[in-house]
């Protein structure tokens, strides 16, 4: 069922991948991603753990109404989260690449 390496080989691969995934998650948490809204007038930078690091608001928006600025900040934050999640998927795909899984089995389980 598991081929030449047997179950022991699969378990060893899984352990190695778990170690690589943990290391990758630690690296991802340190990376920063910036989301934008209003054609770059509002920028929100978050880390890989989705913690907000910085918010930049173009001074020209300070004269506009408060509700619009709040909406732009929320949109920029959501854009940053989306970008962070895409980055995480790409990084984690590199960790699982090359691992031989039984047919139909996918990571994460």
UniProtKB/Swiss-Prot annotation:
Q: Which domain of life is it from?
A: Bacteria
Q: Name one GO cellular component term.
A: bacterial nucleoid
Where in the sequence does UniProt note compositional bias of the Low complexity kind?
10-19
Where in this protein does the record put region Disordered? 1-21
Q: Which Pfam families match?
A: YbaB_DNA_bd (PF02575)
**InterPro entries the record matches:** YbaB-like_sf, YbaB/EbfC
GO MF terms here are:
DNA binding
Where does the UniProt annotation locate this protein? Cytoplasm, Nucleoid
Question: Which keywords does this Swiss-Prot/TrEMBL entry list?
Answer: Cytoplasm, DNA-binding
Family, according to the entry, reads as follows: Belongs to the YbaB/EbfC family.
What does the function comment of this entry state? Binds to DNA and alters its conformation. May be involved in regulation of gene expression, nucleoid organization and DNA protection.
Q: How does this polypeptide assemble, per the annotation?
A: Homodimer.
The name this protein goes by in its record: Nucleoid-associated protein APL_0075
Provenance organism = Actinobacillus pleuropneumoniae serotype 5b (strain L20)
């Amino acid at each position: 069922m598991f081929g030449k390496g047997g179950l022991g080989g699969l378990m060893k691969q899984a352990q190695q991948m778990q170690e690589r995934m943990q290391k990758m998650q630690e690296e991802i948490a340190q990376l920063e991603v910036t989301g934008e809204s209003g054609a770059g007038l509002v920028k929100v930078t978050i880390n890989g753990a989705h913690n907000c690091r910085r918010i930049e608001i173009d001074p020209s928006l300070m004269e506009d109404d408060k509700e619009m600025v709040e909406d732009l900040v929320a949109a920029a934050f959501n854009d940053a989260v989306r970008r962070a999640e895409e980055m995480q998927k790409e990084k984690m795909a590199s960790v699982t690449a090359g691992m031989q899984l039984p047919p139909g089995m996918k990571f994460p389980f």
